[in-house]
């Protein structure tokens, strides 16, 4: 199943924390999560699917001091 994944790492290492994890499973659902000290938090899943496989889209993420 095709998917898109965007991760905002807290450091330049692969095993670092992930402040924001965004994964689109085209045609199915979207998952958002974060990882601290090697442990994933509770994922947030959305069945609201605005993305379609093969269709172009713009991804814009606002980064504020206290939230995304």
UniProtKB/Swiss-Prot annotation:
Q: Name one GO biological process term.
A: T cell apoptotic process
Q: Major location, coarse class?
A: cytoplasm
Q: Which is a Gene Ontology cellular component entry for this protein?
A: cytosol
Q: What stretches pass through the bilayer?
A: none
Question: Which keywords appear in this protein's UniProt record, sorted alphabetically?
Answer: Cytoplasm, Lectin
List residues of the Galectin domain: 1-68
- List the GO molecular function terms: carbohydrate binding
InterPro entries for the chain = ConA-like_dom_sf, Galectin-like, Galectin_CRD
Location in the cell: Cytoplasm, Cytosol; Cytoplasmic granule
Function of the protein: Regulates immune responses through the recognition of cell-surface glycans. Essential for the anergy and suppressive function of CD25-positive regulatory T-cells (Treg).
Question: What binding partners and quaternary form does the record give?
Answer: Interacts with CEL.
Tell me what this protein is called.
Galectin-10
Can you name the source organism?
Pongo pygmaeus
Origin organism lineage: Eukaryota, Metazoa, Chordata, Craniata, Vertebrata
């Amino acid at each position: 199943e095709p998917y898109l994944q965007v991760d905002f790492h807290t450091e330049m290492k692969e095993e670092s924390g992930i402040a924001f994890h965004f994964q689109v499973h085209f045609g199915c659902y979207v998952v958002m999560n974060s990882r601290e000290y090697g442990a994933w938090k509770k994922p947030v899943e959305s069945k609201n699917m605005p993305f379609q496989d093969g269709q172009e889209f713009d991804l814009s993420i606002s980064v504020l001091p206290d939230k995304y």
